[in-house]
Amino acid sequence: MSAPYDLVCIGAGPTGLACAIEAKRAGLRTLVIDKGCLCNSLYHYPVNMIFFTTPELLEIGDLPLVCAAEKPTRVEALKYYRKAAEHYELDLRLGEQVTNVCGSDGRFEVHTRSGDGVTASYTARKIAVATGYYDLPNRLGVPGEDLPHVSHYYTEPHPFWRQDVVVIGGKNSAAEAALDLYRNGARVTLVHRQPALGANLKYWVRPDIENRIKAGQIRALFDTRITKIDRDFVFVSGPGEEQKLPAVQVFALTGYHPDFAFLRQLGVQLDPETNKPAMDPQTHESNVPGLYLAGVVIGGNHTSEIFIENGRFHGKQIVAALTGVTPPAPAT
């Protein structure tokens, strides 16, 4: 086995990359492991997505993100993070899933398995977990959810021109998908279990989706729950009636959550109500000595509290703790 790494970062999204860059700049031998591709969550975002934020708030490693318009696109962000990894010559193991972490502070053993079944292990003095949350959708828990025409991820509208599509959810992802589908010729029904759209819709999305609903261009069913999905219909129960909605495609855009089971496997204590992990807010060290947390995993169920914009600074706090430097104030 090779010499131990000073730090192994689990997760190669923007937060994990930022953490690895900070560690490398501090002279720490660092490895980044991810079960998917680089920035796997961003890769699975809608193809034509434009970020809500401006480019400087997505930057890591003091590298500028240059984009053609005011706000970066998904493609521009992916290119930027590839270039950042190349610039800092990060040591990456992509397509390797962490199956187990054993040992203790000062000498952890990280075991992985690749998609073709090849196993590997790495020794690390410290661990940073930055696994995000986009891999694990909040499931509906209804029959038919696993049918091939049901997806928890929206990609693009083209295949659904002149087709019946049901979008489930009432927050930004669902509203934007419904609008995109409508504008590209799909017949869209939006189903939401709450009595109204989410309170935190983007300021330019809310009037757009509300006007489309008011005009009857997008059908919306509020206070309505999904009861079953089959190959042709979505069965719903709403105020005073049950009905079935024709659908060649169903997008269940009901949110996502961190891998709490993995955190528990590592020994991290979670709050029984919020699932927020036990963690020192200054150093980001969990209750497991030598095991640090970064990014949205620290938010528990409240995934809307952590974004790339603030998660990208968590690595500075972690590396400051590892090198004995006074950590900066927690990112907000």
Where in this protein do the model-derived segments appear?
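FAD-binding core/adjacent interface of flavoenzyme oxidoreductases
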Residues: 1-10, 25, 40, 44, ...
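Rossmann-like dinucleotide/flavin-binding elements
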Residues: 2-5, 9-35, 153-197, 243, ...
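Beta1-alpha1 glycine-rich phosphate/pyrophosphate-binding loop at the start
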Residues: 5, 12-90, 175-203, 271-273
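Short glycine-/acidic-enriched loop or helix-start segments at secondary-structure transitions
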Residues: 19, 42, 103, 138-140, ...
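Short, glycine/charged-enriched secondary-structure capping and boundary segments
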Residues: 23, 45-49, 107, 141-145, ...
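Alpha-helical elements of Rossmann-like donor-binding domains used by nucleotide-donor carbohydrate transfer enzymes
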Residues: 80, 208, 314-317
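A Rossmann-like FAD-binding core segment of flavoenzymes
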Residues: 87-124, 183-274, 326-332
